[in-house]
A protein has these predicted regions:
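A donor-sugar binding/catalytic signature common to diverse glycosyltransferases
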Residues: 12-14, 219-266
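Short loop/helix-cap segments at secondary-structure boundaries that form the rim of catalytic
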Residues: 22-27, 43-46, 127-135, 206-214, ...
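Conserved catalytic-core segment of nucleotide-activated headgroup transferases in glycan assembly
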Residues: 114-115, 129-216, 221-223
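C-terminal amphipathic helix plus adjacent low-complexity
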Residues: 101, 111-112, 119-120, 286-396
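Conserved nucleotide-sugar donor-binding subdomain of glycosyltransferases
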Residues: 1-21, 66-110, 114
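Classical protein tyrosine phosphatase
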Residues: 19-45, 137, 179-200, 243-260, ...
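Conserved nucleotide-sugar donor-interacting segment of glycosyltransferase catalytic cores
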Residues: 1-66, 125-127
Length: 396
């Protein structure tokens, strides 16, 4: 299919992180909508000309967002630089691979980026610090959420019968909890075993070493429906975006233990919006977990803040799915949406910052300053000579 140019498509929908897929836009000559299943990345924002600032409007791979110290700012700037270097090498290698597959006639990715008509971001604007974006960037946060369904009978019975409530633990699909250091797993077990709550833990193995009677494990759980159950007191999570959305929609406070990707970014927002507590996996301990559980379960403000944030996020004239469908049909109706692209779209940073103009201004100022120094130096020497001449005349 990839080499069959007779194929016709009205629209191409790509995962935004898979930049090499833009080669298909050249082959099939169809409009492109990039869909980011996470938040924004520097590369995606640059393609559409959206504002990006590593400190004011950080992208989702930044680990520190609020209350930055001077050292934090340097660290985040270096983080941004490192990510861009990795991405540049990836783009270079991707160009080589695409040339081998499709031949030398395939344009480089830096040109193919101009074929992007629209960007869908599966994140809420408030989670992006209300980043200014052009009209072809559409926020569809919570797109993956589904209407509530009945829980399976055994799970519903377990939750309904809990006397004091249930703590739910899941580290998502990209983290295998069984591979965590045993002492960290044991710290979690020790902390939750000392609470009056039942514990439901998504665990991919047949047995959890050191499991106490109040802990129930399961390899798969309908998370979004589970979180909506009124007996859920708290969600201990790795901080993934989809898990975060589901917890907010269910009104459940969180304890975040970030481990990779955008998880630090998301957990930073837990703390800022006062909907949860962050625990660093490098310094995790039974005492820290116990304190976090006690704080959240005894302080109703965390749950109230989640409910308030949910109201702010979802008080919109249409759902994320309806918005995504409308704009998808819009792009198809108009055979693209190039008219919505910002002037800065896919513009190199040196052009975006007008470094050529800045260099001319700096050179002009340096020329004026240099000329002024030369003139003043000449005048100074001239005055000195005149003064010396007058003294000589008077002495004679």
């Amino acid at each position: 299919m990839l080499k069959d140019k007779s194929q016709k498509f009205d629209l191409l929908l790509f995962e935004a992180y898979f930049i090499p897929l833009l080669a298909l836009s050249h082959l099939f000559k169809a409009p492109v909508i990039q869909v980011s299943s996470l938040g924004s990345m520097e590369e995606n924002l640059q393609i559409v000309g959206a504002v990006s600032h590593p400190l004011l409007y950080p992208t989702s791979l930044h680990q520190k967002v609020y209350d930055l110290t001077l050292c934090d700012k340097f660290a985040e700037l270096y983080n941004e630089y490192s990510i861009n270097q990795v991405l540049n090498r990836f783009i270079q290698k991707s160009d080589e691979v695409l040339s081998r597959i499709f031949g030398v006639e395939i344009p480089p990715l830096k040109e193919l980026k101009n074929n992007v008509d629209m960007l869908f971001l599966n994140i809420h604007p408030v989670w992006e610090r209300n980043r200014p974006v052009p009209p072809n960037v559409i926020y569809v946060g919570g797109l993956h959420t589904k209407p509530e369904k009945e829980l399976r009978k055994d799970l519903k019975t377990y939750l309904d019968s809990s006397k004091h409530g249930v703590i739910y633990i899941s580290f998502g699909t990209n983290v295998e909890p069984a591979l965590l250091p045993p002492h960290k797993i044991q710290a979690i077990i020790n902390a939750v075993s000392k609470t009056p709550y039942d514990v439901l833990w998504k665990w991919n193995q047949d047995e959890l070493p050191g499991r106490t009677p109040n802990i129930k494990i399961s390899k798969w759980l309908s998370q979004s429906d589970l979180l909506r159950h009124p007996k859920i007191k708290l969600f201990i999570t790795q901080g993934g975006l989809q898990s975060t959305d589901e917890a907010i929609l269910a009104g459940v406070p969180l304890i975040g233990m970030p481990m990779l990707g955008d998880q630090w970014f998301n957990v930073e927002h837990y703390v800022y919006h006062k909907i949860g507590i962050k625990i660093d996996m490098d310094t995790i301990s039974e005492e820290k977990i116990s304190k976090a559980i006690h704080t959240i379960t005894k302080d109703d403000s965390y749950r109230q803040n989640v409910v308030r944030l949910r109201t702010l996020m979802y008080d919109q004239p249409q759902s994320s799915l309806e918005r995504a469908v409308w704009w998808t049909e819009y792009v198809i109706r108009h055979s693209g949406a190039r008219h919505l692209r910002a002037p800065a779209a896919n513009m190199p940073w040196h052009q975006y910052l007008e470094l050529e103009l800045v260099s001319y201004v700096v050179l002009g100022l340096l020329s004026v300053i240099t000329l002024a120094i030369i003139v003043l130096s000449y005048l100074y020497k001239f005055v000195q000579k005149q003064a010396a001449f007058r003294i000589k005349v008077k002495g004679s």
